[in-house]
Amino acid sequence: MKKLKVIALLICLCASFTFAEEYHWPRSYFASLGMGAQVSKGDFNERAISGKDTAGVKGYIHPPALEFIATPDLMLGVNLGAFSFAMSFQYWVSEQVIADFPDESYKQDTRIWRFGLEATYNLFYPEFFQVGFGLGYSYNSVKSDDIAIFSSDTYDAEFMGSAVAFIANIHYYITDNISMVPAIKIYESWFKNVHCSRVETNDLDPYLWQSFVLATVSVQYQF
């Protein structure tokens, strides 16, 4: 979270910086709301995590497989000439298969949220059709019900980590203020902590790595 605060501060400084008149960059703000679907592959699909509680009792935490997830995508940001800087937020709850569980059909409700910062450069600016490429950094949380098993008891568990994003999008301006924005975002994620009430918060060694590919279509309003 400290990294996110530093990056957010840098974005605010960039947005508020005023160039000399001959080097002035046009500035505008935007908000967008979209819907997308993402697929993922990685350690979440393959293995359970073993651990011990304070009494030395061994148990297992089974992560959700996260094979297919639908999610809204909310963004707020600023345009500085051909550059765009934004905060993004995604949140969704869906039923997911639990990986490496004795009952292969076992499913549980899984809550996934991601908060991040993105920076893109828009080719062909200021035309009505623009192609953007950029990078992002985000904080991720994945929580499922009853996936930690110690003896015969089950507990909720939450995986926490970060991700680097690679972004490609298209802006098609229907009017001067409204555009359609299809996008592809690839998140390379690492989860370094897991929390459940039986073991509190444990550092994961090695980390759990998971790749997400998210495709979205958004409506953006620029002002």
What do the predicted segments below correspond to?
Residues 39, 72-151, 155-164, 172-176, ...:
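Gram-negative (and chloroplast) outer-membrane scaffold detector with strong preference
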Residues 20-85, 214-223:
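Short glycine/proline- and aromatic-enriched beta-strand/turn motifs that initiate or cap beta-hairpins
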Residues 1-27:
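Cleavable N-terminal export/targeting peptides
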Residues 44-48, 59-61, 94, 98, ...:
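Predominantly the C-terminal beta-signal and adjacent terminal strand-loop region
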Residues 4-7, 138, 187:
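Residue-level detector of intrinsically disordered/flexible regions characterized by low predicted structural confidence
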Residues 53-60, 100-103, 149-154, 198-203:
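Extracytoplasmic loops and strand-loop junctions of Gram-negative outer membrane beta-barrel proteins
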Residues 12-15, 83, 186:
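Alpha-helical transmembrane segments and their juxtamembrane interfaces
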